[in-house]
């Protein structure tokens, strides 16, 4: 459905504000226009390209991962509030998928969610004690997975972290991670 330029640009800004990780291709599909039109609209509205938007979100990251080295985190953490919430993104590439079907291997989605659950813990030691996971939709090469983690409950040496992963706005993975941590000081 084509819209008038001003209306389209207003909706474009709202869409990007709601999901800064959305690609120009996805926006073009959503608004029924060419990728070039989306890029021109972004330029007119002074909205940076995807890479710059990701960097902007990452610069707002307030806390530093304690429980594991950054190079061991699977996916790129773009927001982190220790013991509260975290967000990471994973661009699914051909090395992440089965060659015959083009569907992402489940352990990559689990690795992204699990490493985010470890990273969110405000402790030098964090281990997964138990995980209950659900895959709700297949993920294919070329899709971007945005994982959002939230701490639900903190006890002496256990923390419950809930992770939901999305492609666009569609849930593709969810998990409840019971994390072991060294006992918190009282």
Swiss-Prot record:
InterPro entries in UniProt: HotDog_dom_sf (IPR029069), Thioestr_dom (IPR006683), Transcription_factor_FapR (IPR017275), WH-like_DNA-bd_sf (IPR036388)
The keyword Repressor appears for this protein: yes
Source organism superkingdom: Bacteria
Keyword annotations of the record: DNA-binding, Fatty acid biosynthesis, Fatty acid metabolism, Lipid biosynthesis, Lipid metabolism, Repressor, Transcription, Transcription regulation
Family annotation (SUPFAM superfamilies): Thioesterase/thiol ester dehydrase-isomerase (SSF54637)
Gene Ontology terms describing biological process: fatty acid biosynthetic process; negative regulation of DNA-templated transcription; negative regulation of fatty acid biosynthetic process
Pfam families referenced in this protein's UniProt entry, alphabetically: 4HBT
MF GO annotations: DNA binding; DNA-binding transcription factor activity
Family affiliation: Belongs to the FapR family.
Described function: Transcriptional factor involved in regulation of membrane lipid biosynthesis by repressing genes involved in fatty acid and phospholipid metabolism.
Name listed for the protein in its UniProt record: Transcription factor FapR
Organism annotation: Halalkalibacterium halodurans (strain ATCC BAA-125 / DSM 18197 / FERM 7344 / JCM 9153 / C-125)
């Amino acid at each position: 459905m084509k819209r008038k330029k001003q209306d389209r640009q207003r909706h474009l800004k709202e869409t990007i504000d709601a999901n800064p990780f959305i690609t120009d291709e996805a926006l073009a599909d959503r608004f029924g226009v060419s990728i070039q039109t989306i890029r021109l609209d972004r330029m007119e509205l002074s909205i940076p390209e995807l890479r710059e938007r990701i960097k902007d979100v990452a610069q707002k990251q307030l806390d530093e991962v304690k429980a594991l080295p950054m190079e061991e985190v699977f996916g790129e953490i773009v927001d982190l509030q220790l013991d509260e919430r975290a967000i990471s993104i994973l661009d699914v590439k051909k090395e992440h998928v089965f060659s015959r079907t083009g569907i992402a291997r489940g352990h990559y989605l689990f690795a992204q969610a699990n490493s985010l659950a470890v990273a969110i813990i405000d402790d030098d030691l964090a281990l997964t004690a138990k995980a209950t996971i659900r895959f709700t939709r297949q993920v294919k090469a070329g899709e971007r997975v945005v994982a959002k983690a939230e701490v639900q409950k903190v006890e002496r040496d256990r923390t419950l972290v809930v992770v939901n992963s999305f492609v666009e706005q569609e849930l593709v993975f969810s998990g409840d991670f019971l994390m072991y941590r060294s006992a918190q000081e009282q």
